[in-house]
Curated annotation (Swiss-Prot):
Its EC number is 3.5.2.3. InterPro entries: Amidohydro-rel, DHOase, DHOase/Allantoinase_Hydrolase, Dihydroorotase_CS, Metal-dep_hydrolase_composite, Metal_Hydrolase. Substrate binds at H63, L64, R65, N95, N279, H310. This is Dihydroorotase. It comes from Caldicellulosiruptor bescii (strain ATCC BAA-1888 / DSM 6725 / KCTC 15123 / Z-1320). The lineage of its organism: Bacteria, Bacillati, Bacillota, Bacillota incertae sedis, Caldicellulosiruptorales.
Amino acid sequence: MILIKNAQIVNSIDNKLEKADILIVDDKIEKIGKNIEENPDKMIIIDTSGKYVMPSFTDIHCHLREPGFEYKEDIKSGSRAALAGGFTTICCMPNTNPPVDNRAMIAYIKYRAKEVSPIEVLPVGAITKGLSGEELAEIGFIKEEGAIAISDDGKCVMNANIMRNALLYSKDFSIPVISHCEDTNLSEGGQINLGYVSTITGLRGIPREAESIIVARDILLAKETKAHLHITHVSTKESVRLIKMAKEWGVNVTADTCPHYISLTEEEVLGFNTNAKVNPPLRTQEDIEALIEGLKEGVIDCISTDHAPHHKDEKNVEFNLAASGTIGFETAFSVLFTYLVEKNGFDIGKIVELLNYNPRKIIGLSPNIIKEGEKANLVIVDLKKKWEVKEENIVSKSKNSVFLGKLLTSYVETVIYNGKILKKDGVLSC
């Protein structure tokens, strides 16, 4: 048994704070109430005075690199990094080697996750065979085997007819399509956002229209097919406007953005910082403001990390040779608290909604809720703690965080999943 004393409970649905004790028996929340009797001989007692207890988080977009790229990350190391950040459900993208484009690969991911992961790992299947963009994968079999979505993430499905057919099949099989929106005719060879910083650094720029053109295309295709389109890692103000318009039309479209897009601008690239090379690229302050407004209004539904680990040798090279991507599991909550709550007045309940209720709804899962009879999946956070992101403290196998050296507020101290304490006072037990 676990007894959490003096909890300030935040549930994303009603957005109300409740001060109470929480008794966990086996894998469920047995009781929530005032002054629950302590029994130190039979209980693990955790005093959370001054801290907050909230449902654990879900990430619908990450890269675990297994199979094929285990030198960057693997299912076990990535799951531990996710756990360190408060995530107990993560959805891994199919751009592995070989790609997750058939039922056997879906089965492999599920088997490996069950074998080595302390948390829930859900596979995303490919839209096209080999992520080639040329021939649809066997979407029905992929769904039947347990994929929670389909995506060619890392690549855009450039053929509009292929994308249209994918949406039609996805509707029949009730599976969302996660779209990586990037017109490669515009972005090819680009390194960073096209603008002031690309001009002064001499790095080739990627026009913002590379994203918004495909966002517009896919919205129109979703409107026609009536399929569930999810637009991932939104980074521009134009994309926000297009998604808002689509929702006003009644299109079945959802969207996410990432912590780095709501906090950092293209100026992070100055000095040729390869950890700031991400895809889509970091944009401008105007884009940040539009994304934050989109989150406030519900135009952008949730936050994903797009956790993209790369070996140091793939980052410690000339900028135009460096791999794109940043790790994100371990900093996500703290970045959101620092940049949305502290700097933009968001309610803490809204953050829980962005990391729990909404992402789970998008992939068809019930939310994690702190309620009697529900599974004990929760995190304890210290909202006052300030910490610097340092390479030596990163759990992920790769250390390529765009937030290295940044000072963040709030810290995920303890994580309980299915009634088991997997992280306590900042230390993982798995």
